[in-house]
Amino acid sequence: MRRIILASASPRRKELLRQLIGDNFLVSPSSYEEPPQPDLAPEELLIRHSIGKARDVAKHFSSGIIISADTSVLYNGEVLGKPNFPEKAEEMLKKLNGRKFRVVTGLTVLDLDSAQEISESESTDVWMSEMDDEQILAYVRTGEPLDKAGAFAAQGKGAVLIERIEGDFFNAVGLPLFRLGKILEKLGVSVFDESFS
């Protein structure tokens, strides 16, 4: 069995990877600093960040497969990252209220044994339902929107805010499992392997 290393401290990514391959992976959060690169398209920027995270974690291992991801919400040409205080979460939710937006993830899988690195992006369209100001504030008060791209959690209480999703639901949570499975297959790793059960 190949050693799998998740380059993320995100509880959501850990849980999604666990659904795919069980508990057979290590968690090694990256300390990569995301430099501002305003000239890049958002998809390219997220891929660059995922590459940076994977390569940062690779410094600590000589063997294994490193998985890293970077997710943001795109609305009207603006990249909405993770709000770190309630007022910012409220502002983001008011922008997305009753509108369609896109969740984009840059995904990198780095095979240290073969020196292969595969990076791709995944996009998911999301339609948020309309909420009044009190509903937005009530959701913000739960604390759930903090530290979530776009200030919502599709897998938590935020699920009731989502009217419709087109594309990979798991991408909207932070790790596109379909694309990840296909990349692992390219590297000779099957999620159906008995060692992952």
From Swiss-Prot:
Reactions that this protein is recorded to catalyse: dTTP + H2O = dTMP + diphosphate + H(+); UTP + H2O = UMP + diphosphate + H(+)
CDD domains, alphabetized: Maf
MF terms in GO: dTTP diphosphatase activity; UTP diphosphatase activity
Cofactor(s) listed: a divalent metal cation
Main location: cytoplasm
Keyword field: Cytoplasm, Hydrolase, Nucleotide metabolism
Gene Ontology terms: biological process: nucleotide metabolic process
EC number(s) per entry: 3.6.1.9
Active site: 70 (proton acceptor)
Site residues (Important for substrate specificity), renumbered to this chain: 12, 71, 155
Top-level taxon in the UniProt lineage: Archaea
Locations listed in the record: Cytoplasm
Assigned GO CC terms: cytoplasm
Primary enzyme class: hydrolase
Family matches, as InterPro entries: ITPase-like_fam (IPR029001), Maf-like (IPR003697)
PANTHER family: BIFUNCTIONAL DTTP/UTP PYROPHOSPHATASE/METHYLTRANSFERASE PROTEIN-RELATED (PTHR43213), BIFUNCTIONAL DTTP_UTP PYROPHOSPHATASE_METHYLTRANSFERASE PROTEIN-RELATED (PTHR43213:SF5)
HAMAP family for this protein: Maf
Entry's family note: Belongs to the Maf family. YhdE subfamily.
Known role: Nucleoside triphosphate pyrophosphatase that hydrolyzes dTTP and UTP. May have a dual role in cell division arrest and in preventing the incorporation of modified nucleotides into cellular nucleic acids.
Name of the protein described by the UniProt record: dTTP/UTP pyrophosphatase
